[in-house]
Amino acid sequence: MPTHRGLRHLALRVTDLARSRAFYERFLAMKVVWEPDPDNVYFSSGSDNLALHQIAPAELAQYQPLRGQLLDHVGVIMENPAQVDDLFRDVQQDGARYGATIAKPPKQHRDGSYSFYFADPDGNVIQALYEPTISR
């Protein structure tokens, strides 16, 4: 059986590309690496890649029933709990301007990890996570 070398990217359909672009630049510090046309933008953090694709208004109805049901969340790893708290404060203070909402406040988990959840303008949930065994 062929093996893969890892996940290349995550692609999300969005309803307002400009608003979503601002969200991912502001809160996840993603950098645009390619913008082939007005309906698509590709980001990288240096090691992780994200693609955003504008949903055409005529196609929106076919995606609405699925929204929030297929993707549970995307996790981003943070170096330490203080960074989780810093990002939480940033989203609390500046999130509304970028269409961000807090989904779950910071919490210490049983496995020693620490995280909070927030949603992008289209309701895609992101977990900002400190995980002791891999955050080092």
PLM segments and residue spans:
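N-terminal beta-strand motif that seeds the catalytic metal site of vicinal oxygen chelate
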Residues: 1-18, 74-76, 132-136
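Short glycine-enriched loop/turn motifs at secondary-structure junctions
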Residues: 3-6, 67-71, 109-110
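Vicinal oxygen chelate
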Residues: 14-18, 74-121
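Conserved active-site tyrosine of GNAT-family acetyltransferases
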Residues: 20-25, 123
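Major-groove DNA-recognition helix of helix-turn-helix-type DNA-binding domains
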Residues: 28
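Conserved short beta-strand elements that form part of the metal-binding/catalytic scaffold
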Residues: 31-68, 125-130
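Short beta->alpha transition motifs characteristic of CBS
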Residues: 109-110, 129-135
